[in-house]
Swiss-Prot record:
Function: Catalyzes the formation of the alpha-1,6-glucosidic linkages in glycogen by scission of a 1,4-alpha-linked oligosaccharide from growing alpha-1,4-glucan chains and the subsequent attachment of the oligosaccharide to the alpha-1,6 position.
Catalyzed chemical reaction(s): Transfers a segment of a (1->4)-alpha-D-glucan chain to a primary hydroxy group in a similar glucan chain
Record protein name field: 1,4-alpha-glucan branching enzyme GlgB
Subunit and partners: Monomer.
EC nos: 2.4.1.18
EC top class named in words: transferase
Gene Ontology biological process terms from the UniProt entry: glycogen biosynthetic process
Protein source organism: Mycobacterium bovis (strain BCG / Pasteur 1173P2)
Amino acid sequence: MSRSEKLTGEHLAPEPAEMARLVAGTHHNPHGILGAHEYGDHTVIRAFRPHAVEVVALVGKDRFSLQHLDSGLFAVALPFVDLIDYRLQVTYEGCEPHTVADAYRFLPTLGEVDLHLFAEGRHERLWEVLGAHPRSFTTADGVVSGVSFAVWAPNAKGVSLIGEFNGWNGHEAPMRVLGPSGVWELFWPDFPCDGLYKFRVHGADGVVTDRADPFAFGTEVPPQTASRVTSSDYTWGDDDWMAGRALRNPVNEAMSTYEVHLGSWRPGLSYRQLARELTDYIVDQGFTHVELLPVAEHPFAGSWGYQVTSYYAPTSRFGTPDDFRALVDALHQAGIGVIVDWVPAHFPKDAWALGRFDGTPLYEHSDPKRGEQLDWGTYVFDFGRPEVRNFLVANALYWLQEFHIDGLRVDAVASMLYLDYSRPEGGWTPNVHGGRENLEAVQFLQEMNATAHKVAPGIVTIAEESTSWPGVTRPTNIGGLGFSMKWNMGWMHDTLDYVSRDPVYRSYHHHEMTFSMLYAFSENYVLPLSHDEVVHGKGTLWGRMPGNNHVKAAGLRSLLAYQWAHPGKQLLFMGQEFGQRAEWSEQRGLDWFQLDENGFSNGIQRLVRDINDIYRCHPALWSLDTTPEGYSWIDANDSANNVLSFMRYGSDGSVLACVFNFAGAEHRDYRLGLPRAGRWREVLNTDATIYHGSGIGNLGGVDATDDPWHGRPASAVLVLPPTSALWLTPA
């Protein structure tokens, strides 16, 4: 039987104050008004559809027309209770009627345990409860599918869901706040599986803003700023890699890392295309790892990506999150580890992102002397707030678990550790002890590192920390920050200063090449020749080398060999492996044409390929990287000849002698102390003709005799080519 007559009751309309808040978008519990509610022997159904011309409740085979009361509120009183299920048939002007389950009849999708853990900052899978999640519920009338939305905005006056589904209308989908948690929630039936959405937030400051979801898994392609509902059906093929990762300790393994900015490596490639081309290239060049500059969504394509606006979404510029998974999967199946740059130090002030999210300082510290980073014009996270700390720790775990990422390189750690970092006198506030240390940031970093290594054994966390803060790579249980490694910024600055000088003057700066060994084992180091050295007028590694092209090429080859031989892991920014001559620019990709035009670039690229092969095969270059037992000087003091020489030792008993001639002239009859007599094979000569060098060398090896030298029982006489490196191993 069809019924369309209107039924009335005394509770048809809500209280005027309730109605006013609903219309204004500031009602904290719209579910208490909308949906089905029993009053005596009646059930009242209310629906808030401001632009509808007709709303009908479908109860089984019966139809009940809702009366339009005011301002888009429709209601009907049904003459019975114990309503099990119903649908709404909504008609808009000029449109066909459409039938949908009522969003305001569903229970919250977050439980008390989830909210409690979040409030304490201890929810290790927070991304599974906040954000947007496709869900299905079985009802009396069948399965209802849709998307649940949840967002933290504790000081907001009201929050509504807006998107393509409702014409970006801020009235039709008001959300409810779940008690004192500050989490606003709504399940919306039939929401498109890849639909765009935002949250309309009525801020505590009276300003209404449309915000991207802080936990969005997907986004519109910038410069558009909406979030996109995203789910994954990706099937991984890297089981062997992941099983092996859990058993490894990266500190004691080979790690030579190729640093990549995806947008400018070869412009125009998608994640899926990069899965083929980038993977093949890295395998060919012999790197063990790739480090991706920030892949989390950021507004400006021409940037490195360090001002993140969607921490849980891989940038949509190159494809979907599953496409990014395919890139990681391909690298893993090729034996390449994947590190991503992660930016928990600060975030941009874009009005649609995290800043002043609910009209108050929420993710950022409320004190401007702590909550703003003056150098970058960004906000600083409030590391002491449990919910903010949980947002960041869970984000680290999200990348490690959901995308199988093998490591996080944490950007700008020094700016987190010091309250007075880059601040003028009087522009910062001390900690509770009167010091400059940011104690909350220290606790956050310790928690992040400890949790990440617990949840994902075998991963690596790397700090970009430019000061002498003690214990960066010391375990947290003995007071350290808990990082696996840190960038050795001192080594980078000293080395580049030295090799940039004309060889005539290098002898006066010999200490710049020896100083790093005074502290080489105080932390677990990565030696970075990174993106920071090819931008802002710094030129390139090639451009730093003095002399003509022949001398520049020799200088760059010897620098790279020195980097790979020095204790610590290696990192090299893209393009430097073939001696790119032009500074990086967001306007173009790498200058691959150099490989077609001159032998110097081909020679440098061949050298990097060979030193990576030698490096992986010789544990002396990596297995004792972090202990003094892995290194000893042969001669640190030959400044007159601009020569450095040292031994590297492996945990398997292997040895490697390394000698570097940074003079512009060759040295003949150069006696080098060695640990044993016999034949020593020249496994690397950076001046070899295959690298477009001059071909000066030792015919593949030398014979060491029992003539003590440099405090060692044996020695050999060598020819040292100009601006070169030689690596020798016992034959």
